[in-house]
Design a protein with these regions (language model features):
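N-terminal alpha/beta PP-like core and its mobile active-site loop of ThDP/TPP-dependent enzymes
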Residues: 1-263
């Protein structure tokens, strides 16, 4: 959302091919960026101006933080000559954004901009999660020179295969029980066929986390529904009574919704 401290950025965007989407509130901008990042897996960017403008971003950015969506948040700031003077709308953005972000930094010079922006984007992808940059107005108005690092290497996290010991241990645990439930999250995107085959092989129903609810058609016979606040009683009982809960593509953990008996 535009504001005085972001005017140099808005002018640069106006002269580029970058699309600027206006919103009515900074929290809405952060939520929209989080939604885009979750749907595409690609970095999304939002911005807020000095003081209350950037403060409002924080609430929406927790959506990206908790759901591990790659988002770059930009905070406009007063010119550097006013730092430390109790100037109007003075805040400490780096402190404010520390809890919600994986990376937060202030760009103090035009020469620093390229490397720091690249590092922030890399951090957002590596999490994935939120990276934050504070942009003083006078720095934004300064022409940056020199080469800019390529973004060709910036990608969502690579895939990793489990080591042989972990695979063998998982197989041992599966063989030792009869009642298995598979809980699916957003990390299962792109592997639905494999998930269905696993369900058939183990004769295990599929339940989903909040972000996994769109993975499969609701009339799929393997699909029981959701667990947790949006869950159903049959799902809760299936998870409560299972001997092994396989969590695939999710870090979901609400103790009141998970098995309580020691197995």
């Amino acid at each position: 959302m535009i504001g005085d401290s972001l005017n140099p950025l808005a002018d640069a965007v106006r002269r580029s091919k970058v699309e600027w989407i206006g919103v009515r509130h900074e929290e809405g901008a952060a939520l929209a960026a989080a939604g885009q990042a979750k749907l595409t897996g690609q970095l999304a960017v939002c911005a807020g101006t000095t003081g209350p403008g950037s403060n409002h971003l924080v609430a929406g950015l927790y959506e990206a933080c908790r759901d591990h969506a790659p988002v770059l948040a930009l905070s406009g700031d007063m010119p550097r000559k006013f730092h430390g003077t109790d100037y109007i709308q003075t805040t400490e953005p780096d402190l404010l954004f520390r809890d919600v972000s994986l990376y937060t930094e202030t760009i103090a010079s035009a020469a620093q901009a390229g490397p720091v922006i690249h590092q922030a984007m890399a951090a957002a992808y590596a999490g994935p999660g939120v990276a934050h940059l504070t942009l003083p107005q006078d720095v934004l108005a300064t022409k940056a020179e020199g080469s800019v690092a390529s973004i060709a290497t910036l990608r969502p996290r690579p895939e990793f295969a489990a080591n042989e010991h972990d695979v063998a241990e998982l197989a041992r645990r599966i063989d030792a029980v009869d009642r298995i439930v598979i809980m699916c999250g957003a990390g299962c995107r792109g592997a639905i066929e494999e998930l269905q085959k696993l369900s058939d092989r183990l004769k295990a129903p599929l339940v989903h986390s909040f972000r996994g609810k769109e993975l499969m058609a609701y009339d799929d016979p393997r699909w029981m529904g959701g667990l947790g606040i949006i869950g159903t009683r049959p799902v809760y009982e299936a998870v409560r009574d299972c001997e092994l809960l396989l969590m695939v593509g999710t870090d979901y953990l609400i103790p009141t919704s998970c098995p309580t008996k020691e197995r």
